[in-house]
């Protein structure tokens, strides 16, 4: 899920920054955690050969997440969506009363595993990907995917028993829950590698592992492109991978070129079979790869004036000290390879595409946009949050249920390495001590 090509653009134009965080003792940074988006790459790094037991791999991943959050003095709100991977889906009517924020059951665990690689559409009109040879290829990866699937019920139980707040939005995307928490000022950042968070106007921490975490600020991206948030959303909604199929989607670079030129690009570039395969591989890597992967490649400088960056594009947010500057060296625009300006392989009816885009933006705005109450008050309704007290006995019981012989060792290791302790209520952090945070 995300905006096709946005991560590549942010990497090449050096729009990500490193933050130095200095916290006073007892203060926390409220942060929303896109749980599966963060946990899955960590589990892959812990067990690249997929040889570890699924329960142990899930536990090790959770312990590493807890340890990172503790080192950075973060107060996390874990957002979970059931773990189902959905390919393309149209917008649906949103109702907060239908959000099932209760604890997931074992049925959800099995459902998530069974649907890990199966396309799903909420609107019922999305194209199916698993057909012909591609369907056979997906079925061949099924066993590996099921073995790599984390235990969602185990994750939920350990998170709640540790006393951290949770948001469970079954049947919906966790990204929208994270964006809602950010725009309601419940959290200051979102920990996720999904470019869709930047599309929704959130300040994102893409990698919390380094001593100086990597972050992307939506305000910096908008100032660099000299766009408003509304203009940015209306332009790049054509690049959303959850809304458009691979045959009808634009890349970020292609849509930006069309926006700068002021006219649509009618003909896709001609390419041989070899170049098409290279393009597809590049698109897959750009869409599914982690942001940390791009940091190993040599950066390319960009010309801010060529992209229309207005005055103040290199400014810094209050309270945050950026450890690297924004690009200033020139790079000709037309030197970008044509494969990075990916055009749709199949044209849609303009009216139908425009209608679908507007419905999706309205659906997204229902999560992060303001609503008028009683013709007087304007507010954004927050998703329901659940928080329980820290219970080490419950942690032991959970581990004993999944691994009776290793429960003592894992429980002691989890309490010591993660430095678990009673956490303050969310209200005290979000509305009290959070105002005293000093980031420099």
Curated annotation (Swiss-Prot):
Q: What is this protein called?
A: Virion host shutoff protein
Q: Where is the composition biased (Low complexity)?
A: 266-281
EC number of this enzyme: 3.1.27.-
- What InterPro entries does this protein's entry cite? PIN-like_dom_sf
Sequence segments annotated as region (Disordered): 98-144, 265-312
Annotated localization: Virion
Task: Give the residues annotated as coiled coil.
Answer: none
Q: Which GO terms describe its molecular function?
A: endonuclease activity; RNA binding
Per the UniProt entry, what are the Gene Ontology biological process annotations, in alphabetical order? symbiont-mediated degradation of host mRNA; symbiont-mediated suppression of host gene expression
């Amino acid at each position: 899920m995300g905006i096709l090509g946005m991560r590549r653009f942010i990497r090449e134009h050096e729009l990500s920054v490193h933050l130095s965080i200095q916290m006073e003792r007892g203060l926390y940074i409220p942060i929303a955690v896109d749980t599966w988006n963060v946990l899955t790459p960590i589990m892959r790094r812990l067990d690249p050969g997929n040889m570890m037991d699924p329960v142990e791999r899930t536990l090790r991943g959770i312990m590493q997440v807890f340890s990172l959050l503790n080192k950075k003095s973060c107060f996390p709100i874990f957002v979970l969506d059931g773990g189902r991977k959905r390919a393309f889906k149209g917008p649906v009517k949103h109702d907060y009363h239908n959000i099932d924020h209760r604890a997931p059951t074992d049925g959800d665990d099995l459902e998530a595993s069974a649907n890990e690689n199966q396309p799903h559409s909420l609107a019922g009109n999305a194209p199916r990907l698993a057909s012909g040879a591609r369907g056979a290829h997906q079925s061949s990866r099924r066993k590996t995917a099921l073995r790599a699937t984390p235990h969602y019920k185990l994750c939920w139980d350990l998170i709640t028993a540790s006393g951290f707040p949770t948001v469970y939005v079954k049947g919906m995307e966790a990204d929208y829950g994270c964006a809602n928490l950010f725009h309601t000022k419940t959290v200051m950042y979102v920990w996720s590698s999904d470019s869709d968070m930047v599309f929704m106007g959130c300040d994102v921490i893409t990698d919390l592992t380094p001593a100086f975490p990597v972050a992307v600020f939506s305000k910096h991206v908008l100032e660099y492109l000299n766009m408003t948030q509304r203009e940015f959303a209306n332009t790049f909604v054509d690049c959303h991978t959850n809304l458009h199929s691979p045959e009808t989607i634009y890349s970020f670079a292609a849509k930006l070129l069309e926006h700068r030129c002021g006219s649509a690009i009618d003909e896709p570039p001609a390419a041989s079979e070899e170049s098409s395969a290279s393009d597809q591989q590049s698109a897959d890597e750009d869409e599914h790869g982690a942001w940390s992967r791009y940091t190993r490649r040599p950066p390319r400088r960009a010309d801010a004036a060529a992209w229309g960056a207005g005055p103040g594009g290199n400014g810094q947010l209050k309270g945050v000290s950026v450890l690297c500057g924004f690009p200033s060296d020139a790079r000709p625009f037309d030197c970008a390879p044509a494969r990075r300006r990916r055009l749709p392989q199949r044209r849609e009816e303009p009216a139908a595409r425009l209608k679908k885009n507007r419905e999706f933006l309205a659906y997204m705005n229902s999560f992060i946009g303001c609503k008028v109450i009683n013709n007087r008050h304007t507010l954004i309704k927050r998703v329901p949050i659940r928080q329980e007290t820290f219970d080490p006995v419950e942690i032991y019981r959970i581990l004993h249920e999944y691994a009776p012989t290793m429960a003592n060792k894992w429980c002691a290791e989890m309490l010591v390495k993660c430095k678990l302790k009673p956490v303050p209520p969310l209200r005290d952090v979000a509305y009290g001590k959070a105002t005293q945070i000093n980031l420099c």
